[in-house]
Structure formats: C-alpha cells, structure tokens
Regions:
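Extracellular mucin-like PTS domains
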Residues: 189-201
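Acidic, His- and aromatic-enriched active-site or binding-groove loops in soluble protein domains
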Residues: 14-47, 75-81, 140-143
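Alpha-helical scaffolding within the catalytic cores
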Residues: 54-66, 96-105, 121-129
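Active-site groove signature of glycoside hydrolases
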Residues: 1-22, 50-53, 69, 73-74, ...
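Aromatic-lined carbohydrate-recognition surfaces of secreted/lumenal glycan-active proteins
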Residues: 1, 32-61, 112-123
Length: 201
C-alpha cells in the first residue's frame, strides 16, 4: 500500500494500432483524462506515476502529448535491431543511443519531464549514451520468448556492453537502492527538476 507504481495506459497513442488511438488525438486525450480522474478521484489511487508513451515519427507526433499536468514521465518504445539503424546493418545488437528521439521527446515537454525507454529490444551502450548525452531514465528490454530472445539472445544484446552498463556509476541497480527506501514518511520533499537544474521548494 502506498508504494509508487508506474502506469502508461492508454499506451502507444500516436501508434494508432489500438482502438483508443484510432480516432485521433482528441479522443485519446479524453480517454487518458477520464481514466486518470477515475483512478484518482473514484478509486483514491494517488501512488501512481503516469507515463505517456510518445513517438517521433512526424511533426504531428507532439500533438499526442497529454500535457504537463497529466503525466509525470514520457517514454519511447524502441525496436530497431533489424530496421531503422544508423550503422547500415540489418541484424545483430544495435548499440545506438537513439539520441535524436531522446531529444525530440525532451523537446515535446520543454525539458520538464524525464524521458524513459519503456520497451526496447537492445540496450544502448553506455559509451554512446554518455558521449551523446542521451540520458534515458530507464530501459526495459522485452522478455525472452519462443519468438525472440530479447535479453539472452546475442542477436539483440551485446552482453559485454550490457554488463558494462549495469556496472557503471551511471546505472542504479536494485542492490544500490536504500534499504529503507519506503520508510521516509508520507510527505515527500517537493522539488522541480528540469534539464537545466533542480530547485527545492
């Protein structure tokens, strides 16, 4: 009870492959707002972190953004081991940091929200993310299945690069979290964080 939980429903708005986005941005935003209001006002769920999945396919992609007051994070689903690569290859691990997409999403929110990689096939290399300043909040490889081994398969991951990322100071792993993480009371410290800095209020 009270533990934070991330939700991204309705997801993939601008993808238009789900029923909730086929009617366009207006209907999608109405559904997002209605669901959020119901979860908070009717069910009393105030521990949810709202994450909106966005894309960067065209100039109109930003129109799907639900607004600063309606989401806490923005995220991107990335699957491009086999296509849309920048290295000319069509298979094998793709270590690209997807910097262009990171900064497009950052621009949609004017630097006011953190940007995550909500789903992905490969994990970007640590060196590429650092050099290109693509500071994804987190990454979440799709699980292994009979169809694709997204985590353990060598066609998707460079396991040496994966180990380097997990062992770097840049990456926070579960064992590095405070043991008393959820025992600091009900009143959080209020801060405003943007790409230009953090202010405590």
């Amino acid at each position: 009870e009270g533990n934070p939980s991330t939700t991204s429903d309705p997801t993939d708005g601008s993808g238009a492959w789900f029923w909730w986005s086929k009617e366009g941005t207006k209907v999608y935003k109405q559904l997002w707002n209605r669901l959020q209001d119901k979860l908070q006002d009717e069910y009393g769920l105030h521990n949810l972190i709202y994450e909106e999945n966005l894309y960067a396919w065209s100039d109109s992609s930003a129109e799907w953004y639900v607004g600063d007051d309606r989401t806490d994070l923005v995220a991107y689903d990335k699957y491009n081991t086999q296509y849309n690569r920048h290295d000319g290859k069509t298979s094998g691990p793709n270590l690209d940091a997807e910097t262009g997409i990171f900064y497009k999403l950052n621009g949609y929110v004017n630097g006011t929200k953190m940007v995550a990689m909500a789903e992905n096939d490969y994990i970007s290399s640590m060196s590429n993310m650092l050099v290109e300043h693509a500071y994804w909040l987190y990454f979440c490889p799709w699980y292994d299945s009979a169809n694709a081994l997204f985590v353990s398969g060598e066609n998707y991951q460079d396991h040496d690069e994966m180990k380097a990322l997990y062992n770097s100071d840049f990456c926070i792993t579960l064992d590095e979290l405070p043991a008393d993480l959820f025992n600091h009371g009900d009143q959080p410290t209020t801060t405003t964080t943007t790409t230009s800095g953090t202010t405590t209020t």
